[in-house]
A protein has these predicted regions:
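Extracytosolic helix-loop segments that constitute the early lumenal/periplasmic catalytic or substrate-binding loops
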Residues: 37, 53-91, 95, 270-281
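Short acidic/glycine- and proline-prone juxtamembrane loop motifs at membrane-interface regions
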Residues: 48, 149-162, 203
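Transmembrane-lumen/periplasm boundary regions of multi-pass, lipid-linked membrane glycan transferases
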Residues: 54-60, 64, 209-341
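Transmembrane-helix motifs of polytopic, lipid-linked glycan transferases
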Residues: 109-131, 169, 173, 341-347
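Membrane-interface alpha helices of multi-pass inner-membrane proteins
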Residues: 141, 186-203, 240
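Hydrophobic/aromatic-rich transmembrane helices and adjacent perimembrane loops
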Residues: 153-154, 207, 333-338, 366-415
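Signature aromatic-anchored transmembrane alpha helix within multi-pass, membrane-resident enzymes
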Residues: 193, 214, 239, 408-439
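Catalytic lumenal/periplasmic loop and adjoining terminal transmembrane helix
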Residues: 204, 421-570
Length: 580
C-alpha cells in the first residue's frame, strides 16, 4: 500500500516535494521572497491610511506612553472613533520605533518577522498532522510561501494581519500538546497564550477564536485525544491571558465602568460601530432579511475563494483599485479549484477512499481540519461579506493551503504524465508573476486609502515657501478623515504644533457624515492657524498663496491658470502655488 509520500516518483518536482529536507529549502525561499517584496514595496509601494494611523499611535506610545488621543496604554485603540485598531500590531510597532528609530520600514519589521517565523510553526504543524507524508507537508509549505496575501502583508502593516500568523503558532502548540506527552502542560499553556494574543490582533477574533476552540476541544474530547483536565487548564489560561480583552467587552457593553488593569486603560469606545457594520448582528428587519444576508455572506465568500483572482482582474481593468488589499488572495490561478478538490477528498467517505488519496490519515488531522471547516462556516455566515475586504478571512488561508495541497497530491498520485508536475510548477511561477504585477500597479493608483499623492502635494506646498498652507474642504467625510491622518503622518516634525486629532475627526470624519453644517469642518490644523481647512466653491475663492486639494482636481479659469502654478499628482491631489 502506497502513501502520497511513497508514490512513484515522476520527475524533479515530485522528488523534491517528497524529500524530508525540502522544508528547510522552502523556508529559505520564503525568506528570500519576503525580503524581495519588502524592499519592492518600500521602493514602489505606498502607505495605507490604516498603517498611517497605526504608526501615529505607535509613535505617540514610543514618545509619550499614550495613543494619539492621549489615552495611556489602551487595551484597544479607539482609532477611528467608530472603529478600533489592533493593540498587538500597535504595541509591537511602538517597541520597534522606540528601540530602532522612527522610520516606516522599522514600523513594518515586526509583522514581517512574525510572518517569517510562522513558517516554522507551519512546518511543525504539518509534521504533526501528516507524519511521514512529506509531499503533503512540503506542498502546504510551498503554497504558503508563494501565497500572494502573505507576501503582500509581509511588506506593510495592516493591523489585523497578525491574526493568521498568531493562530499558526497557537495551533502548532496545541497539536504538539495533543500528540506529544513531553511538556504537555507547557504546550497547552503556550497555545492558549497565542489564542489570547489573537484576540488583541483583530476584533473579529472575538467571534472566530471562541467558535473554533469550542468545536476543536469538543471534538478532541469526544475522540479521546485530550483529557478533561487539560481542557479545564486551557480555559483557565485563556481566561487569564484574555482578561483585559474580556474586561473591555464588559466596559463596552456597559456592565462595567471605565477602569485600569495592570497599567492598561480600559475605556468604552462610545462611537464604536464595527459590530453592527461588519456582522450579521447589524442586519435590521425580519428574520427573512437576516437569513438572506447570511446566505449572501456565505455565497460571496465561497465564490471569492473559488475565483481568487476576482479582485486582481478588476484591478487590471480599473487601475484605481490597484493596491486593494483583496487583490492578494490565498492563491492565484487554479488555487480555488485545487482547494475544492482537496475538500471533496477530505469529505469523501472513508470506506470509498483509496489509500493513496487518503491524505488526512490521523485522527488529530481530521479533527483540526474539520473544526476549522466548522468555524469557517459560522464565521462566513456571521461576518459581512465584501469583495474588497477578503482579509477578514485570512485566518482560514492555511486551511485552504492544506486542502489545495491535497488537490496537488491527488494530481501527482493519479496521473503519471510528467506534464502534471511541470504544469504545477508553471502555475507557481504564474502566481508569483501575478503578485508582482499587482505590486507594480502601485505607481499608478489614485485612492484616498493611500497617501503617496498627498505626500507629494504636501511636500510641494511646504517647499513653496508660503507662510500658510490652506487645505480645501472635501465633501466626502471619509476623504476628510484620511486627510487628517495623512497630515499628521507625513508632517511628523510639526506634530507638536498641531491641534488634537480627536476633535478634528469628530468634526470632519465619518461621524460627521450627513451633517450639512460646513463651519465646524473649517478649523485650524496647526495651533497658530497657518495650516487650516478652508472652503473653495468657485475660482474667486482662491485668494491665498498655497492650496492643497485632496481627492479632486480643481477646474481653473484662465485668470487662475496664469496666477497659480498647478502641480497635479495622479489626478488625485493638487497643489496650487501662486506664481512669484
Amino acid at each position: 500500500m502506497q502513501t502520497a509520500s511513497s508514490a512513484p516518483r515522476k520527475g524533479a518536482l515530485t522528488r523534491a516535494l517528497s524529500a524530508p529536507g525540502t522544508a528547510n529549502g522552502l523556508i529559505l525561499l520564503g525568506a528570500v521572497l519576503q525580503v524581495l517584496f519588502f524592499i519592492l514595496y518600500l521602493i514602489n509601494g505606498d502607505v495605507h491610511v490604516d498603517e498611517a494611523m497605526l504608526v501615529l499611535n505607535a509613535r505617540s506610545l514610543a514618545r509619550e506612553g499614550t495613543d494619539i488621543f492621549g489615552q495611556r496604554m489602551p487595551v484597544y485603540f479607539d482609532t477611528w472613533l467608530y472603529g478600533g485598531q489592533s493593540s498587538l500590531a500597535t504595541y509591537l510597532a511602538a517597541v520597534f520605533i522606540r528601540l530602532f528609530g522612527n522610520q516606516i520600514w522599522i514600523a513594518r519589521l515586526p509583522l514581517a518577522l512574525t510572518a517569517f517565523a510562522s513558517l516554522f510553526a507551519l512546518k511543525g504543524l504539518t509534521r504533526l498532522l501528516f507524519p511521514g507524508q512529506y509531499t503533503v507537508q512540503n506542498t502546504v509549505l510551498l503554497l504558503s510561501i508563494i501565497e500572494p496575501w502573505r507576501l503582500y502583508q509581509s511588506a506593510w502593516t495592516l493591523d489585523c494581519a497578525y491574526l493568521p500568523f498568531v493562530l499558526l503558532f497557537a495551533l502548532y502548540f496545541l497539536v504538539h500538546a495533543v500528540e506529544k506527552p513531553k511538556a504537555r502542560l507547557l504546550f497547552y499553556t503556550l497555545s492558549m497564550a497565542c489564542f489570547a494574543l489573537g484576540l488583541y490582533a483583530y476584533m473579529a477574533a472575538a467571534i472566530l477564536i471562541p467558535v473554533l476552540l469550542v468545536i476543536l476541544y469538543l471534538s478532541l474530547l469526544i475522540k479521546k485525544k485530550m483529557k478533561f483536565r487539560y481542557a479545564l487548564w486551557s480555559v483557565a489560561v485563556l481566561a487569564v491571558c484574555a482578561l483585559p480583552f474580556l474586561l473591555l467587552g464588559l466596559v463596552q457593553a456597559g456592565l462595567l465602568k471605565d477602569c485600569n488593569f495592570l497599567g492598561l486603560s480600559i475605556t468604552a469606545m462610545d462611537s464604536y460601530a464595527r459590530g453592527n457594520s461588519t456582522t450579521i448582528f447589524g442586519a435590521a428587519g425580519s428574520a427573512g432579511a437576516v437569513f438572506q444576508r447570511a446566505f449572501s455572506n456565505l455565497g460571496g465568500v465561497l465564490y471569492n475563494i473559488l475565483v481568487p483572482d476576482l479582485m486582481l482582474l478588476q484591478s487590471a481593468r480599473y487601475p484605481t483599485l490597484s493596491g486593494n488589499v483583496s487583490n492578494y488572495p490565498f492563491g492565484h490561478t487554479v488555487a480555488g479549484l485545487l482547494a475544492l478538490a482537496g475538500l471533496l477528498l477530505f469529505l469523501w467517505p472513508k470506506k470509498h477512499r483509496k489509500a493513496t488519496t487518503d491524505f488526512a490519515k490521523t485522527t488529530t488531522a481530521r479533527v483540526v481540519i474539520g473544526s476549522f471547516l466548522g468555524a469557517f462556516l459560522v464565521y462566513a455566515i456571521v461576518v459581512s461579506y465584501a469583495s474588497n475586504a477578503m482579509y477578514r478571512y485570512a485566518a482560514f488561508y492555511p486551511l485552504l493551503h492544506i486542502l489545495a495541497a491535497f488537490g496537488v497530491c491527488w494530481l501527482l498520485v493519479s496521473f503519471s504524465s510528467p506534464a502534471v508536475p511541470r504544469l504545477l510548477a508553471g502555475l507557481a511561477v504564474v502566481s508569483l508573476a501575478l503578485t508582482g504585477f499587482a505590486f507594480g500597479n502601485f505607481s499608478t493608483h489614485n485612492s484616498a486609502l493611500y497617501g503617496k499623492s498627498f505626500e507629494q502635494a504636501l511636500t510641494a506646498a511646504r517647499d513653496s515657501g508660503s507662510s500658510e498652507i490652506l487645505l480645501v474642504d472635501s465633501q466626502d467625510p471619509y476623504f476628510r478623515e484620511r486627510e487628517s491622518v495623512f497630515l499628521r503622518f507625513y508632517a511628523d516634525d510639526k506634530i507638536d504644533q498641531m491641534t488634537p486629532l480627536e476633535p478634528e475627526l469628530r468634526a470632519r470624519g465619518g461621524l460627521s457624515a450627513g451633517n450639512p453644517d460646513v463651519a465646524p469642518r473649517l478649523r485650524p490644523v496647526t495651533k497658530d492657524g497657518s495650516w487650516r481647512y478652508v472652503q473653495v466653491e468657485e475660482n474667486r475663492d482662491l485668494t491665498d498663496d498655497c492650496y492643497i486639494f485632496f481627492g479632486t482636481v480643481p477646474q481653473l479659469d484662465k485668470t487662475r491658470q496664469q496666477e497659480y502654478a498647478v502641480k497635479n499628482y495622479n489626478d488625485f491631489c493638487v497643489t496650487l502655488v501662486r506664481k512669484k
